[in-house]
Amino acid sequence: MLKEFKEFALKGNVLDLAVAVVMGAAFNKIVTALVSYIIMPLIGLIFGTVDFAESWSFMGIKYGMFVQSIIDFIIIAFALFIFVKIANTLMKKEEEEEIEENTVLLTEIRDLLREKN
């Protein structure tokens, strides 16, 4: 049972997921800082306040906090979209190169077989 767990835990997909979770947490801090210290002050110039969480409320319902969370989510989602798009582009290039190497190797094998016959 321990051996099976070790095989499972050391599989590429599990390790990739673990790395992704850690990187996602670190990336979240970067995006939160971007939103809090750069984007929200710019939006604050338009609306007159930076902190929607405290200033936008009605009878104890802090809908400003909800608006701020939506802005955070949109920025994080967009940044992740760009990151995944770039990663997919890079992975596609690697796959194309690998296919070309296989094609060259198969062509050489075919040519050698033709020479033997």
Swiss-Prot record:
First-listed, main subcellular location of the protein, grouped into a coarse class: membrane
Keywords, ordered alphabetically: Cell membrane, Ion channel, Ion transport, Membrane, Transmembrane, Transmembrane helix, Transport
Membrane topology according to the record: Multi-pass membrane protein
Leader sequence segment: none
InterPro entries in alphabetical order: Mechanosensitive_channel_CS, MS_channel, MSC/AndL, MscL_channel
SUPFAM superfamilies: Gated mechanosensitive channel
Assembly behavior: Homopentamer.
Protein name from the UniProt record: Large-conductance mechanosensitive channel
Taxonomic source organism: Staphylococcus saprophyticus subsp. saprophyticus (strain ATCC 15305 / DSM 20229 / NCIMB 8711 / NCTC 7292 / S-41)
Taxon lineage: Bacteria, Bacillati, Bacillota, Bacilli, Bacillales
Gene: mscL
